[in-house]
Swiss-Prot record:
UniProt similarity note: Belongs to the universal ribosomal protein uS11 family.
Any one annotated GO CC term: ribonucleoprotein complex
Pfam families: Ribosomal_S11 (PF00411)
Lineage of the organism: Bacteria, Bacillati, Cyanobacteriota, Cyanophyceae, Oscillatoriophycideae
InterPro entries found in the cross-reference section: Ribosomal_uS11, Ribosomal_uS11_bac-type, Ribosomal_uS11_CS, Ribosomal_uS11_sf
Function, as annotated: Located on the platform of the 30S subunit, it bridges several disparate RNA helices of the 16S rRNA. Forms part of the Shine-Dalgarno cleft in the 70S ribosome.
Record text on subunit structure and interactions: Part of the 30S ribosomal subunit. Interacts with proteins S7 and S18. Binds to IF-3.
Biological process, per Gene Ontology: translation
Gene giving rise to this polypeptide: rpsK
Protein's UniProt name: Small ribosomal subunit protein uS11
Amino acid sequence: MARPTKKGGAKKQKKNVPNGIAHIQSTFNNTIVTIADTRGDVISWASAGSSGFKGAKKGTPFAAQTAADNAARRAMEQGMRQIEVMVSGPGAGRETAIRALQGAGLEITLIRDVTPIPHNGCRPPKRRRV
């Protein structure tokens, strides 16, 4: 029986995007770095989990640094040079991720904290007793 020929999928072409926006979402359990162009189309992304960390290690500053480094490297392959950074969340990897983006060679023009603050919204989780 003849095997059907495989149709080639659409290859992602390299765009030349000189500047964009990096969104860093840092929670207690993970850090996600998404780099988009100024229109909002995602160029690259990485997280502590996608960078090879598992479990509690995903919440560490080193995992955030690795994730930011991976995302920055992929964005620079697309031609990105300047970024604005939007940081949200209370996690441990906030500052480390910003330093990693800078260390990778991206020029940071703006850092903005966009953490949502409730006007007494949801009830917070119960206090931990260790």
